[in-house]
Amino acid sequence: MEPTSKKPGLTFAGKLVVFLFVAGCLYGAYSLFLHRPVSGARQSQTAANDAAAAASDGEHVEIGIAYGTEKERWLQWAVGEFAKRDDGRRIKINLIPMGSLEGAQAVLRGDQRIHVWSPASSLYKDVFLQEWQVQHGGDKPVVREENLALSPMVVVMWAERHEAFVKKYGEVSFKTLSQALAESGGWQSIAGKPEWGLFKLGHTHPNESNSGLATLLLMAYDYHGKTRDLSLKDILDPGFQTWAQGFERGVSSLSNSTGNLMREMVLKGPSAFDAVVVYESVAIDYLKNAEGRWGELRVVYPKRNLWNENPYYVLNAPWSSAVQQQAAGKFLDFLLSEPIQKQSLVHGFRPGNPAVPVRFPGSPFEAYKRFGLNVDLGDMCTAPKAEVINNLLQWWQRSVGTS
């Protein structure tokens, strides 16, 4: 029997190579595991760090602003001016037109295009914060907020219709608007003008646009004769609900945008609307355009009114990095600067920066006085609690709303 042959073994050098190879693999695996993102929060932080590094190298940062269309012309101009600056050239701003409430719902759904929410007013803010906590919990979704510009609510009417309306009812109020909407004979009964048809009033969709919500709140405040502490009892009052339901069933349009509603009135003339309830700023922006098409407009301020502050909310959302929040803050500082605030006056806003005056030669509030503009207002109402707003919107949807 032949002796068994002995297999060659590893030399010392070979064993050393194998040991070093295995050790290297183990270290690499450990390193990868240690740096692997383990949650959405870790991924967001990594994205923020990457964005910070990019910004420090002078690379571009991109942010999206969901805004109410009442600010469209002013914001578009401001974005163009901001892009001329050194810091502005590194920040790309995407303007995303949305109804105020529509923008809030988009953020709640996780629309990652949006890093700033700029509705027409703060009316819906508490509702938004409550819904965010329910859906996401954790930190508050707003890291910085400022008011850009102020604008009260107004009723805008064609001058000829306004004259006939006041001759019949004595004043323009939610009570007299309700009476006109209830006239089955329309303008024949109001002013002996059958060719004018029914009385046509428009406001925006209250579940999508802030001005529609503001209109409902002013109706409630006016009905109950108060300016603060609107309560659930007030909203659930059968008398109010019956009156408001009759009013709302006569409304001609439920646009999701205040700017679009005013534009439609000016484009189509009295055949579309005799009157609309909009922001003062939107009315001012269209006063001269309307005059050249269908005649003059008249602006009427409700006895009880609401401020629309056009807030600018920098969002603390999971998809918004620290650098994007800083970029949003830089644009906010730019919007609040005096030259940009002065330009807001051109578009009918009352500047949010108190250093910028409203009354001066050439101001729209001086130039357009004959249309009914007035710097001094009557009683201003306060925003009710979130539960009141929620119940008012739910009542409206069940009673007269459309999906």
Role assignments for model-derived ranges:
Residues 2, 6-11, 15, 36-197, ...:
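N-terminal segment of the mature folded domain
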Residues 214-300:
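Ligand-binding pocket segment of bilobal, Venus flytrap-like solute-binding proteins
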Residues 72-79, 101-104, 122-125, 129, ...:
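Extracytoplasmic/secreted envelope proteins and their assembly/folding machinery
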Residues 2-17, 21-32, 37-42, 56-58, ...:
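Extracellular/periplasmic juxtamembrane helices and adjacent flexible linkers that interface
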Residues 82-86, 111, 118-121, 132, ...:
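Sec/Tat-exported extracytoplasmic proteins
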Residues 142-155, 240-256, 291-320, 324-325:
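Periplasmic-binding protein-like
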Residues 192-224:
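Extracytoplasmic/periplasmic solute-binding protein
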Residues 160-167, 208, 224-230, 318-328:
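Short helix-loop capping/hinge motifs at secondary-structure junctions, enriched
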